[in-house]
Amino acid sequence: MTLYRADPKHGVAWVTGGSSGIGRSLARDLASQGYAVAVTALDDDPIDTLIVETAQMPGKVVAFPCDVTDEPRMARTVAAIEKELGPIVLAVFNAGNYISTPGEALTVKDFRRSFEVNYFGIVNGLVPVVDHMRVRARGHVVLMGSVTAYFGWPTTAAYGGTKAAINILAESLKYDFDKMNIRIQVINPGFVDTPLTEKNMLPMPGLMPVSRATRRMARAIKSGGFETAFPRRLSWPLKVLSLLPQPLCRAVISLTTSWKAAPLRYDRKPPSE
């Protein structure tokens, strides 16, 4: 059976984290393809400017502000989109944050916040939207991962952990989604020049502009392949590296990031009693 592939003639697209960076650029691209695009973000002001930017395109952008960590409100947002715009045929879960987690300054708060936004921010929208897609026996879901999912990098214990979980989520759900004619994809980009990467303390080889990354993602969504990782000159070596014995993998990462020689950046204070 050929799995369903989203088409703007069949319904609307929904993009989370669409007020800036990759999400904003991708929403603009989808509107240019003729989609009515429901854009969800914390603040509707940036979405208002996006609406103006896309006013002359074949499709349109409509704001549905919501905090992706709010489970009940996300369910209501899905219902509102379905009622006001039509059936969601394409859901792109892009909302995310980046919190650096160096080993000498760990906090439970940082880990919890990372998973609340990056992982449960997907699940909170995925569950209600799939309920609608399942009834219609067709749908298309895209999850935003990262090449940091392949193995542990310095300072990415929280962020990389969420992206690894997203990849497992997609891999596991694909078995049953295939039976329901719901296509699921995971996109693992390398380093993209967005407000999130400005917080990254690691070297970022192959850093690419948002517009270029978005074009690659748009092609991936159209092609429908399960996993897309790019740029290849970065993703392929990382995949090979992930197959090596862990001590060797860590040695290569320490060398390429100069992390072994990097000093600790925080005072060594005893934990509060």
Language-model regions: role of each:
Residues 186, 202-238:
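C-terminal helical subdomain
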Residues 146:
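Residue(s) in the substrate-gating loop at a strand-loop-helix junction
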